[in-house]
């Protein structure tokens, strides 16, 4: 049943993406790159309902750093050097959503790195609802070549109900970058930092 956990994780990520339009316009921001003032505004909105926490992927978190170098303390420099990101953003805790891959080739990610969610703790209810229905059905089949095949079926549903206490930040420069190493699925090559197709995977 390990695959069930991965499936639910994938369904939760898809449900969060598709439900972003439930949020009021003031609660969502789309920008190319990280806009410090916009994130501060979202944190202010979410903090009206509780202590805000930022949920994002590692790729998003490494961009959430102050732009002015004079704001870096020695502790921040050490944390950036050791972890590649800050554990808190202006006092707001940053939780990293674990990134997974769709299969054993490690080329396509499960979670879109372009999204960050600001969710207040202590708010009423949880934004994601997961429901299981019925028992687990296990069927075993004997194939013509005498091999056995086992199929497992479990009915599950995932829905997001976002209220006005939740905020979303969309980094359009990361949005949709689901392939690792900027892998080009058509040519089978890797896109380099300057846009060239180079090498094979």
Language model feature labels by segment:
Residues 71-201:
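Sequence/fold signature of self-assembling virion shell proteins
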Residues 23-24, 51, 65, 112, ...:
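Intrinsic-disorder/low-complexity coil detector
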Residues 1-47:
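Alpha-helical scaffold segments that mediate packing/assembly in large oligomeric complexes
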Residues 27-106:
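Long, positively charged binding patches that form subdomain-scale interaction surfaces
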Residues 15, 19-23, 27, 61, ...:
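A sequence-level detector of short, solvent-exposed, charge-rich linear segments
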């Amino acid at each position: 049943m390990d695959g069930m956990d991965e499936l639910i994780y994938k369904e939760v990520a898809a449900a969060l993406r598709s439900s972003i339009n439930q949020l009021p316009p003031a609660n969502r921001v789309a920008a190319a790159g990280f806009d410090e003032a916009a994130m501060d505004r979202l944190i202010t909105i979410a903090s009206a309902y509780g202590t805000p926490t930022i949920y994002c992927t590692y790729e998003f978190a490494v961009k959430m750093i102050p732009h002015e170098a004079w704001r870096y303390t020695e502790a921040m420099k050490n944390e950036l050097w050791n972890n590649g990101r800050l554990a808190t953003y202006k006092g707001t805790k940053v939780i990293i959503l674990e990134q997974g891959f769709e299969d054993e080739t490690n080329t396509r990610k499960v979670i879109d790195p372009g999204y960050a969610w600001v969710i207040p703790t202590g708010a009423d209810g949880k934004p994601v609802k997961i429901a299981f229905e019925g028992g687990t059905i296990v069927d075993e089949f004997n194939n013509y070549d005498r091999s056995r095949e086992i199929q497992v079926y479990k009915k599950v549903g995932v829905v997001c109900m976002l209220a006005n206490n939740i905020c979303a930040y969309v980094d359009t420069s990361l949005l949709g970058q689901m392939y690792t190493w900027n892998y080009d699925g058509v040519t089978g090559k890797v896109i380099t930092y300057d846009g060239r197709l180079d090498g094979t995977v």
